[in-house]
Amino acid sequence: MDFRITEGSSPTSLSVSEKIAKLESCNDSRITCRPVRESKPTYTSGQKHSALLSKLKRSKVTTDFCKLEESKGIICQENLHTEGAKSKTENISGEDKSSQRRTRLKQIQEFISHRRSFLNSNANSVESEKILAENNHMFNVKSKLSNKESFIKTRRPRTNGELSDLSLQPKRIFSEPVNSHPSQSMFGNGVRASSGSYSLKRDLKDYEEELPSSKKRQRTPPPIVVTNFPQEIFPSKKISLSAKRRIQGKYSGENVRARIELARERNRKRDYVSNLSKGHTTNALEENPFNLGPNYRASTRKCNRIKEAINLFAAKNGSMEVPPKVSVGDSVLTTSQKFLQVIREKTALLMNQDSNSVQPQALAAAESPTTKAPTTKAPTSEAPPKGHVKQLAKQLGNIYMPQSINNVEPTSHSSISKVVNPSEKVISKIERACLAGNGNVHPSIKMEKNLELNPHPRTLNATEHKINSRIQVSKLNTKNELANADPKMYLLENLSDRLYFCKLAKLLLRKYPLDIAEHQFALVYSRFQRIPLKQISCLKQSLVAYYSVLSEVGITNEIMLRENRFSSPKTPEGLVSISKLLLDDREHLSHDERSYIQQLQSQIKSQSVHHENAAEEIRKMRNLRNSRINSQQVGEKVFVNPDVKTMDIQETFLQDYEDETFANEGLSASKFKEEFLLISDSKSDLNSEEIATPNSLEFKNNPRIKVPRSLLTILNLHDRSQLKLFEVCHNSEFKDPINLSNCLRNLLEKQLLSYNFTDWFASLGSEYENVYVKFISHYDFSSLNVYASFQKLCCDLYYGSDDYIHSPILQVFASCWLKQNSNYGFLNEDIIVKIVLILIDLHKSTYSKKLNSYVVPMETFVKYALEKLRPLISPDSVCILSKEDKKHWLKYKKNRSTFAKLLFSTWSNLPSDIGFILECMLKEYYDTFLKSPFAVPNAVQAQLHNQVRGDLTPKRNRSSLISELMKSSKLLKQESSGNKNSTSLESDAFKESSFVLNEENGGIYAGKEIDLPEPSVIDGRPHFSVFNYTHHMQEEKTHNRLPWHRRGMISYKKMVLSKNNRWVAGYWKKKYCIVDSGKLIFYKSDHLDPNACSNVSPIHREFGLQSCLASPNLPPSINSNRNNVFYLNIPGNECYLFEAPSVLAMNEWIHSLNFNAAMITCPPLPENITNTEYGWGYILTRAEKKAYYTAADGTKTFVGDLAQLTRWSPMDIQGLQDIPRPLRDKVHILRDCVPSLLETCLLFQSLPEKMEKCFAAGSKNYLKAMDNWNRKMKFLYERSMMYKEYQRVLECEYEYRKSHDFYPTLSPVRYPYDFKGL
């Protein structure tokens, strides 16, 4: 087989710039080089139309109707195949055959032309059947089903809320590609392995001149029915096969982790509901391990009946229709875009009135569902004032969605991560409401309807009071008169039913428009209460709004309080019921809450159970949830029930709204933040009512910590409870160095400064030298040597910062040490600073981030230090040494050889006694260094632990707490009109200083890269090189979010490449697989329990993933009729096909496989230079001098034909395993090697032009050399694309960690001093 590059994708036919652009633009890992087959298709006699007839038979003729201009008769389409089967052949003469052939050709032309025109205009079915009956003698097809029945069965759409059995659902339609050859072999389970690509043109070669010259249309395969794709990725439930492949390729690697976090929970709930309806107990037990009994099943049936009623109503109103076919380029509105659209409509309606106040009539008109708001903003004659749009948005938010965040009951729940928006139409997609699974409370908790027995009567919170005061609805009485009504009167007494309708209201508002949600909620509520729908028709809007604002966590806690579960549990059954109730919502619990649940279960299951201990654990759970109910405001955005797992997604969701608001006002977001932080105020009013807290009396004895605004960037705030400890003041109050140094010391003692405090403090510059002096003067360096004194300073200031080394802090430290200690006579500040710098270099070179730490010998260290200190020692220096010091240094003189005497003898005018003292000092520091290295601040140590352990728990954004602190401190008041000029001058002065946070220096400290020592320096723990993924997964309990670990049941099929280059496929298997530590493991058991599979079940197969690549783009020779199929390419002659349950699961598997393969694959090694000739070695060098020799008879003998060529093959296809490296180092290595691989591939493409000059055309050596070139070119191209995909996956993971504080910005640097070379 001659492997060559096709003309369309040949890199040799392009220019140099086009070649580089083509190589750089290759995002997928498929090979554009395709082999060219020499075999030609063979046809039997009399079968020239066989290809055309086979195409017409395989196409869905039964589903299409065609129309001719001149119709002759009417025949039902159902008789198309039956009458064609009854047609008889007759023996005719040669003239009759030719005439019949011409008529059949004309009928074929008419049939094809009118079939093409059918897509643009729908033909009449009666006329189409008539024409098809005329052409019936051309086809000889047998079909068991009629066309109409097959059309209805295959194209029946599926409703959204259908909970029927999957066996009754329509099967997906698979259409074969056009370029498949009839001679292809079909393997089992829907996979076709093809050996070549052929088209219909070769079969119609005889009729090429007679056919019309219209453009050959490529038949579009019929669309398939997609059921499990999420709405964010696939907006329509019907999508073509080609569009599906393109979208899968587009979303296979981009923002995988963010999309997984957004849609994983919704897919899990959908699968759970479908499994319950099917009666699968295995999946049901997996999601709900507690058997809830017949009451729970009854409630599930009740939910299904309600859902069927909702679907029936939506079907009548046309809301559940299957949307039309959507192309790839169409845009779909996401939640944030819908939110922006609502804000634009309401803002445009209010701005047309050109008034600053909002009238209730206009707001009511804007909210009415019948009003059609314009999609674009109405132009206004006059520009609105600055801040007008933001003010209108606040007014809309106060009216349509009351933001009662101050007086919320202290009951939290991590499952509700709701964003309070200015419109109640939009509820965040992150809010998880389960309609069928958690709709009712556990049946063991019985509700007492008698309110007298309730020791904790329910009181309406501020949100409900606010709604009751603002929402006034009308009730239709018998005389058709409107009277005031309150939705409170329709509040259900049973708390379980109240909780159910609360979740139902939130689900309807998130899923449907406002008018449909109101009507559906009223319909379900009326059927449940058995009251006429007309009675609550006027309360539709108020009912759904009232129930949607109720807190699910508040109702649940009230259920528990009625039974006195938390205060004094009396029976073990009560504890079991509460633990089951909490575990019903275990998916939304944090890791701390899960640990409390596990402790509670262990205590309940033990024989000697202590009810008081269990009650204490439940109390901890309640306190933890209470601390998380507090709302959080980030700038203009308010978050209720902030969840650490979804905080970053919420900020991304509201980012578009914030940018749009700033754009409407003509103010950028960065400029707004700058003005928000830089408005100066000399006097702060801290005695207002808004700032006063319930325990404000305590601050009289314990005042708050005054903090300047310049320190807000380095504060380390863990939660909102620490906000009451601070009082933000103006920077002018800390002009005194003593005040600022005392503030820093106070914050350091309370561990409230972040790890980048050293960079911030060192960047102040020499202007704040007095601050450095006052800060270091707090330390006591008396009777301590230089090493011990600097080690004491390192507990607060990190020695690994580059700014710290080059700042005047070390000079101040040297002067303070000299003042507190006796001078030896020759020591000065420069010598002490140089000794400190040498010690820092010793630490960096010894404890750098390398596989094996290199310890510098003592002799090398002393010699290097003395050479650095020699220029700083004056020849006139006098050594002053006491008797105690001489006795202290005497042991170094007797036991060890001295270098100082030898070195100082070579240096003129330098006393030897000074060299002896320096040598003894350096040896003592070296011994101390081996025992106790420099200390690391606590904040840097915590950041280092997160880096080494790969801590993937998102941390709360510090800027949100700082913004709230700034807002609560009332620093943004303007001075009186008489002091405006002085205030502006003061503000301009602070803008230029380095103290103030502005747009230029705002993020300089957060992105600062500082170096860290090895973890063994701190606590003796190993680094990433010997890091155990499984141990870390068990310790952190976040294996679902780790990219290097993936486990679960998956269907797969093994494909093997045979000798004739055809893929031989096996059959589909379903096994339990684990991807971890660079390996893919298949277990023989198909059990769902991971512990049973990994501990008990034997291993079916295990292999390393080095040099492997997973991709959703199947090779051209492999076709599959299954959805969500991807393949794993293994070096050699085999690959694996995998089928995932959804697109999100497929992306998770692909990302995990490629991540493990990239981490374990060794970087590309340099090619071995051998004497073996393949066609491009020494022959090309000889051909440059003389390409051929001419004989006497004129024949030419080329140099290449005289050489003996060898078949080329790669040395090691599987590749070598790389040593364990940190993720950052792996990314840097791939960034360096990928461009070199592309350059090598580009240079190798230019060799055929030189090879043609040294070989005779068509000679044996020429064919062998070109075959070697094709083989190596394919290998280089595949390898470069593989490493390019590795680089993309690792960079995506690395940038995701950095942006979410998973992987901190602490990277190693190269040190200027390297002791290895000495």
From Swiss-Prot:
GO BP annotations listed: ascospore-type prospore membrane formation; ascospore-type prospore-specific spindle pole body remodeling; regulation of ARF protein signal transduction; spore membrane bending pathway
SMART domains listed in its UniProt record: PH
Name this polypeptide is given: Meiotically up-regulated gene 79 protein
Localization in the cell: Nucleus
Keywords noted in UniProt: Meiosis, Nucleus, Sporulation
Function: Appears to have a role in sporulation.
Chain segments carrying region Disordered: 177-198, 208-227, 360-387
Domain PH: 1049-1158
Keyword Nucleus tagged: yes
UniProt-recorded Gene Ontology molecular function terms: guanyl-nucleotide exchange factor activity; phosphatidylinositol-3-phosphate binding
GO cellular component: cytoplasm; meiotic spindle pole body; mitotic spindle; nuclear envelope; nuclear periphery
Lineage: superkingdom: Eukaryota
InterPro entries assigned to the protein according to its UniProt record, in alphabetical order: PH-like_dom_sf (IPR011993), PH_domain (IPR001849), Sec7_dom (IPR000904), Sec7_dom_sf (IPR035999)
Biased composition (Low complexity): 364-384
Keyword Nucleus: yes
